[in-house]
Regions:
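Walker B catalytic acidic pair
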Residues: 52, 118-119, 130
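C-terminal engagement/docking regions of AAA+ P-loop ATPases
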Residues: 2-4, 11, 249-335
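Conserved alpha-helical scaffold flanking the Walker A/P-loop in AAA+ ATPase domains
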Residues: 37-40, 94-116
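AAA+ P-loop NTPase domains with strong preference for DNA replication initiators
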Residues: 198-289, 314
Length: 335
């Protein structure tokens, strides 16, 4: 039985989350829902897939997040000629003071707390798989030797939705490794005016660290452990499992789901659903998850995991309608 989380620990989590969100928001204008979703995924211990057109602030957002958390940051531009060694690192021959030569491992960009994998779908499947091992195992293997990655390790991969030529579709196994998928909307008129005003001056705003640099990594891991301690009752577990099941084309699913969906969300999707809900519970000041917490993260955690049929594409299907149908069915079954 997990002991109930104290009020002081919940307050500390909320204050830290709010401070980081506010600090990122000082530099990144707009995108408040996306910033909150990305922070939620970070404290849930997962990775995020970001979709947005070029120039909308993806790199600035991720770099500002790393700065606010006082964590190391690395950016890797994925291209068709990028090799796995360009991601993970490689061994090089080095000559010592005694004249002897030996192989030395030179870490790649993946050896950072926060990694921005820009336009990940431009790399070949072989290179994508190198990042997949890092995301799944928190380690990389080079020349038969395993190297652990820094902890926490947080990948934010971007997709450009308007340039599909020369890209490689992400396999379902890799999509399933992302806790959330977040879409960045185009800024409003007022937001665009603020962006232009704040970024064309001599001293544009910068992000100040919220966590102490010396203890930032251990502090982030401590807050992630706190999320795991949030209580989920059997009733809420059943509700979350029902939502996941109703995204698959089973007899219990909605007609729309059976027509559009080839494969529903995986059990890993259910794990992401509950972990995101646990963060939401803490942000609401509670040590336990409610169905409303689950509902709040259902779209971000499940929609990108669905494999749709050709009929869905012909109908111009939106996977978020499938999630809406699953949520409606789960609410009915709950009574």
């Amino acid at each position: 039985m997990t002991p109930e989380i104290g009020a002081a620990a919940i307050r500390d989590f909320r204050d830290t989350f709010a401070a980081v969100r506010s600090e990122v928001g000082r530099v990144v204008i707009g995108h408040e829902p996306a910033i909150e979703a990305i922070l939620t995924a970070f404290f849930a211990g997962g990775h995020v897939l970001i979709e947005g057109v070029p120039g909308i602030g993806k790199t600035l957002m991720v770099r500002s997040l790393a700065d606010a958390l006082s964590l190391s940051f690395s950016r890797l531009q994925f291209t068709v000629d990028l090799m796995p060694a360009d991601v993970t690192g490689t061994r090089v021959i080095e000559e010592g003071g005694d004249g002897r030569r030996s192989f030395v491992f030179v870490p790649g960009p993946v050896f950072a707390h926060v990694l921005l994998a820009d336009e990940i779908n431009r790399a070949t499947p072989k290179t994508q798989s190198a990042l997949l091992e890092a995301m799944a195992e928190q380690q990389v293997t080079v020349a038969g030797t395993t190297h652990p990655l820094p902890a926490p390790f947080f990948v934010l991969a971007t997709l450009n939705p308007i340039e599909m030529e020369g890209t490689y579709q992400l396999p379902e196994a890799q999509l399933d490794r992302f806790v959330f998928k977040v879409r960045l909307a185009y800024p409003s008129q007022a937001e665009l005016e603020r962006i232009l005003a704040s970024t064309t001056v001599a001293d544009p705003p910068t992000t100040a660290p919220v966590l102490e640099p010396a203890t930032a990594a251990s502090r982030a891991l401590e807050l992630r452990r706190l999320v795991r301690e949030v209580v989920v009752t059997p009733q809420v577990e059943r509700y979350a499992a029902t939502i996941v099941r109703l995204t698959a084309p089973t007899e219990a699913a909605d007609d729309l789901v059976r027509r559009w969906v080839a494969h529903g969300a995986s059990p890993r999707g259910g794990q992401a659903l509950l972990l995101g809900a646990k963060v939401r519970a803490l942000l609401d000041g509670r040590p336990h998850v409610t169905p409303d917490d689950v509902d709040a993260v259902a779209h971000a955690s499940l929609a990108h995991r669905l494999v749709l049929r050709f009929a869905a594409e012909a109908d111009g299907a939106d996977p978020h309608r499938v999630i809406d149908a699953a949520l409606a069915g789960a609410r009915r079954s709950r009574g």
